[in-house]
Amino acid sequence: MTLFPVLLFLVAGLLPSFPANEDKDPAFTALLTTQTQVQREIVNKHNELRRAVSPPARNMLKMEWNKEAAANAQKWANQCNYRHSNPKDRMTSLKCGENLYMSSASSSWSQAIQSWFDEYNDFDFGVGPKTPNAVVGHYTQVVWYSSYLVGCGNAYCPNQKVLKYYYVCQYCPAGNWANRLYVPYEQGAPCASCPDNCDDGLCTNGCKYEDLYSNCKSLKLTLTCKHQLVRDSCKASCNCSNSIY
């Protein structure tokens, strides 16, 4: 079975867009993310892999299912458009990242997620790809420390010539920050950043807000959260002092 996990630049312009067909492949229908057991598989697989990172992470949040992210992911999967969605179309109350997976045969969600994670074989922590131009962005999003909400959707796209099986996961808040792209988490003993909020090596004190500026922590110190700019643009810094964000 040939599997093809790909990024936007690998497929844009090469594969046309066709809406998903209602005639579902029976095996693929069993993977629909409206089912509780499928949601559980997706969340558990992500958390299994997040616990397994090397070097270990001191601030890795435990993932949980998010219905709004799942609805956005399913809506995009239904388009059978093999490129990344517009960022505005994967907004919840947070900005969300996205991983895509296409396959020539029906794969389990665990296989799809594992394929993203396996990019770690070509990744040096804090440095980047070991091989020039190697794809590692799926891996870094899967293990991005602050991305603790996940929602996924899939579609059967029979009008595509080869890659008929389409999987989309969205992650909130989004990872892969440009200013620390190859440092997806802080190294250290598991849960060192959350000793009172730890579940088997993963932190459980995520923040439902996000900062819009990279210097929000310093803005909070100099202007305080009473300043409207800080209050409106640095919601994580102002509201999540005991959380990981």
Swiss-Prot record:
GO terms for cellular component: extracellular matrix; extracellular region; extracellular space; specific granule; specific granule lumen; tertiary granule lumen. It holds the Pfam family Crisp. Keywords: Disulfide bond, Glycoprotein, Secreted, Signal. Its main location: secreted. Disulfide bonds join 191-198, 194-203, 207-240, 216-234, 225-238. GO terms for biological process: defense response; innate immune response; sexual reproduction. SMART domains: SCP (SM00198). Salivary gland, pancreas and prostate > epididymis, ovary, thymus and colon. Residues 1-20 form the signal peptide. It comes from the Eukaryota. Residues 43-171 form the SCP domain. Residues 207-240 form the ShKT domain. Glycans are attached at residue 239. Belongs to the CRISP family. Interacts with A1BG. This is Cysteine-rich secretory protein 3. It comes from Homo sapiens (Human). The lineage of its organism: Eukaryota, Metazoa, Chordata, Craniata, Vertebrata. The gene is CRISP3.
